[in-house]
């Protein structure tokens, strides 16, 4: 053990601050993150291509899907998660939910999509068009192509359920405060690399065929079948890696190998005997805690802001690409670029800057980045309205291409910062909490609150579309709401930073009191990588 607590070399401390004794826990966790993120990236580009490309409503369908599809789905899946958590083990819940998602995606690609218009509600859509105003055409398209809408909803829920709740749930469960500052930065790099790989593979599949299939009814279906094959294969590896981690956490205290060095056998038994909260108490746990409410506001603001920006950008892209294959190729390239920027930020900036300047600085980077890049994107749109296109003409771009390009840049940087700074600081914010607050508060925030944020933006869009009939005519109101969301986000992060410092310091003192021998061995070497600067002396870590 003495060799394991030696400080790292400067190079390794910067790029790979993981001890050899931590490899059996860290490597499966990193691979699990990669494959969960790989599926997330494939599903993200596929759902957009399926629903948006060639649609007469374009990106206007997104606000209606967020409210009438994703919110009910998120509430239902959160209730299912709470109900299952009351009755079954953590491992069974994970495998059952992941297996359910994989089964649906396979069924859609092999059965539902080939049936085409036989399943779609064309007659009902024609009647709705005569009743509803022109601004509600997104709702009509959502109802008419209900199977595509269902695929969109399930793909979105993969993010909130499998990535945010299940994966980060197991990560928080097996990772200590001392490990989190070192583990989470590298795990986020793994997620970013998965975006690069998924984006390039999806782009390649738009031009080539991995496995030819006689089942394909059109060119897009051939691409969809190959993407689904990769999703299911990655899903199998996800289940295998989870079982490996689950077994590891059960056996490590008995074997005495130090893999779960900060949780004693008695603590593990207490965790297993801890009474489960009822499904309906998920939200009540959230509302009882000001700290959890602060995290919820941050998540709410991010999802509101990114949705407001993304719909405007995708509306520009829909006007350029009408083919699903071409649209998918474009979005795949954006996904790959996002992964590249995220990986660079994760390796060279995120982990080190949070350890050096603290949680608050890391948490403020996301809203400030969105404020700057969003300002450039919206500024270009306003310039187009004012015919101020000297730059576009000089570069040989049409006004539409220029604004779409700036929107893509904005999306790449917003997503990249989200996958590095936002996700990392959000997950770190849960660590000082008690087990009940951590598990059920996180499930409520990731499963419901994140969707409420997007739905808030969607409700704004729906109201504005009914009044103005198009996204372009809603820009002034969208700008005002966006500025309010970003301003409130920055204020709450400043408050949360103070609370996080206090709670982390208290947790460090409690851990030091419970584990005096570990404290005596380590405290002379290093300080916590994740507490605020003024609290760093309170939390001991192994770096």
Swiss-Prot record:
The chain crosses the membrane at residues 23-43, 61-81, 92-112, 150-170, 185-205, 222-242, 292-312, 334-354, 361-381, 389-409, 452-472, 477-497. Its main location: membrane. It is found in: Cell membrane. It comes from the Bacteria. Keywords: ATP-binding, Cell membrane, Membrane, Nucleotide-binding, Transmembrane, Transmembrane helix, Transport. One of its GO terms (molecular function) is ATP binding. Residues 533-543 have a biased composition (Basic and acidic residues). Residues 510-543 are annotated as: Disordered. One of its GO terms (cellular component) is plasma membrane. The keyword Membrane applies. InterPro entries: ADP_ATP_car_bac_type, MFS_trans_sf. The keyword Membrane applies. It is a multi-pass membrane protein. Belongs to the ADP/ATP translocase tlc family. This is ADP,ATP carrier protein 2.
